[in-house]
Amino acid sequence: MSLNRLHIEAFRNITSAQLQPGDGLNVIYGQNGSGKTSILEAIYFLGMGRSFRSHLSQRVINNDADALTLFANMQSAEDESKIGLRRFRSGEIEVKINGDKVKRLSTLAETLPIQVITPESFSLLFEGPKSRRQFIDWGAFHSDPRFYAAWVNVRRILKQRNQLLRDESPYSSIQFWDKEFIRYAELVTEIRKQYVDSLNELLKGIIEEFLPQVDVKVSFTRGWDSKTEYAQLLETQYPRDLATGFTVSGPHKADLRLRVGTLPAQDALSRGQLKLLVCALRIAQGKLLKQQIDKKSIYLVDDLPSELDAQHRKLLLQQLADTGAQVFVTAIEPAAIVDSLITPPSKMFHVEHGRVTVIE
């Protein structure tokens, strides 16, 4: 999967821009505030229906516009398709794929799988289990068609269950929901575990490339005691759940644990090593996606020179090239990227005050 045409309108400081990206590495350079990161953000928005920089989507709409518009042609090995999105300041969003209206944003994610490596993405190891669950669930969503519906049902029933707990309902009332909840929770957990097991097989070799002197162990924890049946746990834990007003254990507490020896990776590794570990995780995900469903991710890498030294920039760019994926990389100066490449980039773009120019 790659974008061979991208149209951006009223997105942050980009009034209007047309790009024809290359299949491989696309270098986007310009000064801070020029709009180069906004191009990455626009691609992400097109694939996810939201920004990776702000939780308030209205903020990405140009101040002089009532809506933003994004459009792309996508090329795969089999065919070409078109995807379009309009986001209004009112909050309304319109999405079309090949001219047909799309109601679920999950369809965007399925159509356009995107991996992001930004200064903020390194929070994967620091911001607690939620970001690591999201990492697992991205892969589980793409690898198993059963996952999304099961995950939606877990969230729906968990919300109802927690409300019953806050209302101090008897367990007999909660038990009615638990039968369905347990079924979906166990399916979500099974798919997550299978995904992490498959990821681990690829990840070991990639980590050895990035961190050859470090033995990183990656494991999945399901969110409750592995020796206890979930149905039994929910029943015995009812008094505790009632006291807290929410379900203490379950798939909503799952985590991806990364350890070096007896220590969590974030305590054992330097900041530079942690950046490399996150890069390894993202690359492994992209490679596994290709292996499982024969679909390539699109990689968005923001401000690479400030995050990695020259040696590790070269290693990351080579690993990205090995995935065969389309890659968009930003930098202030193009030499910081080009000098780390074995072969020239597919395309280069210069951004200044929101205007995009292709460099021949």
From Swiss-Prot:
One of its GO terms (cellular component) is cytoplasm. It comes from Shewanella piezotolerans (strain WP3 / JCM 13877). GO terms for biological process: DNA replication; DNA synthesis involved in DNA repair; double-strand break repair; SOS response. Its main location: cytoplasm. ATP binds at residues 30-37. Keywords: ATP-binding, Cytoplasm, DNA damage, DNA repair, DNA replication, DNA-binding, Nucleotide-binding, SOS response. This is DNA replication and repair protein RecF. SUPFAM superfamilies: P-loop containing nucleoside triphosphate hydrolases. The RecF protein is involved in DNA metabolism; it is required for DNA replication and normal SOS inducibility. RecF binds preferentially to single-stranded, linear DNA. It also seems to bind ATP.
